[in-house]
Design a protein with these regions (language model features):
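Glycine-/small-residue-rich beta-strand-loop submotif within the FAD-binding core of flavoenzymes
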Residues: 50, 79-114, 150-152, 216
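FAD-binding subdomain of flavoenzyme oxidoreductases
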Residues: 96, 109, 114-248
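Glycine-rich N-terminal segment of FAD-binding domains in flavoprotein oxidoreductases
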Residues: 27, 32-92
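General beta-strand structural signal in soluble alpha/beta enzymes
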Residues: 23-27, 45-46, 66-70, 87-89, ...
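Generic non-transmembrane alpha-helical segments
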Residues: 9-20, 54-62, 119, 242-250, ...
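Activity-critical C-terminal alpha-helical subdomain
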Residues: 448-488
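C-terminal substrate-recognition/cap domain of FAD-linked oxidoreductases
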Residues: 228-232, 237-433, 451-456
C-alpha cells in the first residue's frame, strides 16, 4: 500500500523544484494512465536530464514512489500500483543522431517510431525503421519491454546498441563503449569492456533510460513480401514445421507474423457483435469468419530481401515449401485480401511505419490486456500452447485473439484480452483470465517474454527458481535502495 501523504508531499516538492508545468494532477490527464483498479496520484513530465535529476531528488527526499514510462502508457494495466506517481518521459523527445552510412540512431526516450520514421524520410535516408505494430510507441520503450517487429531487424533488444540511464541517486551511466569518453563506436559495438549490463535495464525498475541507440536497416536492393493462409485450426502445426527450418537457416529473415482469423478480423475493425451467437466462437465459426474476409484460420506474413536474383531464387524455394502445407494458399499479389490489411501487413515488413487499420481492443471492448508467452518455432509446441490458451480463454468467456512473431528460433505470442476499461468487473474478469493463462502456460513450460505492470508479480512467481529472483532483488537493493522506482 502506497502512503498517499508521502506521494502528495513528493508531488509538491517536485512542483516547487521544477514549476507547475512539470506536474499534472488534472483528472483528465490522470485518466489516461488510470485503470479501474489503479489511479495515479499525479504525472511528472521532465523536459530534459537536468529536470529529471531534480525530480528524482525531490521525490526521493519526500519518500515518494515513481513509475517511469517512456511515452504515455498503453494497455489495460497501465499503472501497476494505485496512487503511484507516473514519471512520463514523453517531453524528452530529441532525435540526437541518425547516421545513414553506419545505419544507426541515438534517441531520447520520448521519441516514437512515427517521429523517427518522419525524420529519416525528411532527410531522404535509405534506412528502414522496424516497429512492433504501434507507430506511436516509444523507440526506447520497445527496447525496455523487449518488443519485436516484422523486418529482419525485428528483435529490438538485439538491435539496441548503446544506452544511457539515470540511477535513483541522479547519476548518469553510459553502457558499452559509451563508458569510454572519446569512443567512436558507442552505437556500433554493443558490449564495450567488462560485464555487459544493458539487459539489467529492460523490464526492470532499476533506473530510468535517458538515451537509447539502435541499429536501423539499410534499404535492400530488392524484396518480395508474401502471405500464406491455412484454412483449418489444426493447420498451425504443419505451417510452423515448414517455417522453422526457413527461419533457422535465415531464408525468411524477417519477423514472421502468424495471426489467427479473429486477430486479422479485429485489425480490419470487425467486432464480436458482428458475428452470430454469444460467448467464445467455435473453431468452425472462426474459420468461416476468416473465409469471408479472404483469410485463413491462420495467416502468415513473410518477406525475402537481397539482390534481385537471390530473391527470385529464394522465392521459388519458399513458394514450394509453403505450398506443400495441406490446405495452404500462398499469396504474393494481395488478390482476394482486403487492401487495407494487405497494405499495412506488407508495409510492416518493408519499413512503412503506419497505424493498423483498426485497434485490436475494439473486438469486444476499448482496451486490451495482453499475455505474451514464447514458444519454439515448432508445430507441436505452438499447437500445444495455442490449444491450452484457447481453452483457458474459453473458460473465462474470451475469444482467442492472437498473433505470433517468429524471431530466429522462437516465436513471441501476443494474446489479446479485450475489456471495457472503465468497468471494474470487466477489468477484474480480464485480469483473472490473464493470470490463469500465465499459470497454465508456465505449468506447460511456456514463459512470458513481457507483461504489463499490474501482472508483474504474477509472472515473477513463474520465474522463481534458479536463483534469478534473488539476484534481481540484490541488484535492486544496490541500485535503488530506497525503492524510489515502483515494483508492481
Amino acid at each position: 500500500m502506497i502512503d498517499q501523504a508521502r506521494q502528495a508531499a513528493a508531488l509538491t516538492a517536485i512542483e516547487a523544484a521544477l514549476g507547475a508545468g512539470a506536474v499534472d494532477r488534472s483528472p483528465a490527464v490522470l485518466a489516461r494512465y488510470a485503470t479501474p483498479l489503479a489511479i495515479p496520484a499525479g504525472v511528472v513530465l521532465p523536459a530534459n536530464e537536468a529536470q529529471l535529476a531534480v525530480a528524482l531528488s525531490a521525490a526521493k527526499g519526500a519518500g515518494g514512489i515513481l513509475q517511469p514510462v517512456c511515452n504515455g502508457a498503453h494497455g489495460l494495466e497501465k499503472t501497476g500500483l494505485d496512487k503511484v506517481i507516473v514519471l512520463d518521459l514523453q517531453r524528452m523527445n530529441r532525435i540526437l543522431e541518425v547516421n545513414e552510412d553506419l545505419a544507426y540512431c541515438l534517441v531520447e526516450p520520448g521519441v516514437t517510431f512515427r517521429e523517427l520514421d518522419a525524420y529519416i524520410k525528411s532527410k531522404n535516408f535509405k534506412l528502414w525503421v522496424d516497429f512492433p505494430g504501434n507507430p506511436d510507441e516509444s523507440v526506447a520503450a520497445s527496447f525496455v519491454e523487449r518488443s519485436a517487429g516484422y523486418t529482419p531487424y525485428s528483435d529490438h533488444s538485439l538491435m539496441q546498441c548503446g544506452l544511457e540511464v539515470m540511477l535513483a541517486d541522479g547519476r548518469l551511466v553510459r553502457t558499452g563503449m559509451g563508458a569510454m569518453p572519446k569512443s567512436t563506436c558507442w552505437q556500433l559495438f554493443k558490449f564495450g569492456y567488462g560485464p555487459w549490463v544493458d539487459g539489467l535495464f529492460t523490464q526492470s525498475d532499476f533506473a530510468v533510460p535517458t538515451k537509447v541507440g539502435t541499429w536501423l536497416m539499410p534499404e535492400p536492393p530488392a524484396f518480395k513480401t508474401f502471405m500464406v493462409t491455412v484454412e483449418s485450426e489444426d493447420g498451425l502445426a504443419p505451417l510452423l514445421d515448414v517455417l522453422g527450418p526457413l527461419k533457422l537457416n535465415m531464408v525468411v529473415a524477417n519477423g514472421v507474423a502468424v495471426g489467427n482469423a479473429l486477430h486479422e478480423a479485429a485489425l480490419l475493425g470487425k467486432k464480436r457483435s458482428d458475428y452470430a451467437g454469444q460467448g467464445p466462437m467455435a473453431a468452425s465459426a472462426v474459420e468461416a469468419a476468416g473465409k469471408a474476409l479472404g483469410l485463413g484460420y491462420w495467416n502468415l506474413y513473410g518477406s525475402l530481401y537481397g539482390l534481385p536474383d537471390n530473391v527470385s531464387i529464394l522465392w521459388d524455394l519458399v513458394n514450394g515449401a509453403f505450398g506443400s502445407v495441406p490446405g495452404a494458399k500462398v499469396i504474393a499479389d494481395g488478390r482476394g485480401v482486403d487492401p487495407r490489411l494487405w497494405s499495412w501487413r506488407m508495409g510492416t515488413m518493408t519499413g512503412a511505419v503506419a497505424s493498423p487499420p483498426a485497434a485490436i481492443a475494439q473486438w469486444s471492448g476499448n482496451q486490451a490486456l495482453t499475455v505474451n508467452p514464447v514458444s519454439p518455432v515448432d508445430g507441436e509446441d505452438a499447437m500445444r500452447l495455442y490449444e491450452l490458451s484457447r481453452d483457458t480463454c474459453a473458460e473465462h468467456g474470451f475469444d482467442m485473439v492472437s498473433e505470433a512473431v517468429a524471431i530466429w528460433r522462437s516465436a513471441n505470442h501476443r494474446q489479446f484480452l479485450p475489456s471495457t476499461g472503465s468497468d471494474k468487473s470487466s477489468a477484474a474478469r480480464t485480469r483473472a483470465c490473464a493470470e490463469a493463462l500465465i499459470g497454465a502456460q508456465a505449468e506447460a513450460g511456456f514463459g512470458q517474454v513481457f507483461t504489463e505492470p499490474g501482472l508483474r508479480a504474477t509472472v515473477d512467481k513463474t520465474f522463481a527458481s534458479g536463483g534469478l529472483s534473488t539476484l534481481h532483488t540484490r541488484v535492486k537493493k544496490a541500485l535503488d535502495p530506497t525503492a524510489l522506482f515502483a515494483s508492481a
